[in-house]
């Protein structure tokens, strides 16, 4: 079990295909409603939306997976609006931990040990592949 300490924010980072996206604290204050508005009005420019706050504990992994499951439709809706397809990936960043959760659009959940990680969309998910310029350091399925 991976343990996190202190307050951790989950951030959804939506990839728009440019080289301008990155993960930063400025993305941590956007509400779900604001994210929907951004997706509608700036579909190709959205970089990140605030997703949730967790008071961390030893079972934070279960809380994260429950969150992903319960918000799956919202996540896919935003991805489809931003990218025009359901085939992209979204990064769940946990800034204070140095770990991230990666969810492919088909619902597969991965945990990664670097913050800026996107898995290449192929059947192998090979470690060391480059995806949109971000190096995939390591990742493995958790569901």
Describe the role of every protein-language-model region.
Residues 1-34:
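Low-complexity, glycine/serine/proline-rich disordered segments
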Residues 20-21, 28-143:
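Functional cores of ribonucleases/endoribonucleases
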């Amino acid at each position: 079990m991976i343990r996190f300490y202190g307050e951790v924010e989950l951030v959804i980072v939506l990839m728009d295909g440019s080289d301008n996206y990155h993960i930063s604290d400025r993305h941590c204050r956007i509400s779900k409603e604001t994210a929907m508005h951004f997706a509608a009005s700036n579909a190709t420019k959205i970089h990140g939306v605030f997703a949730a706050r967790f008071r961390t504990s030893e079972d934070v992994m279960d809380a994260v997976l429950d969150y992903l499951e319960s918000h799956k439709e919202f996540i896919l809706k935003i991805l489809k609006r931003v990218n025009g397809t359901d085939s992209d990936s979204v990064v769940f960043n946990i800034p204070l931990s140095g770990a991230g959760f990666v969810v492919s659009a088909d619902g597969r959940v991965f945990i990664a040990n670097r913050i800026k990680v996107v898995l290449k969309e192929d059947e192998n998910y090979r470690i060391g592949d480059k995806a949109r310029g971000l190096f995939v350091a390591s990742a493995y399925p958790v569901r």
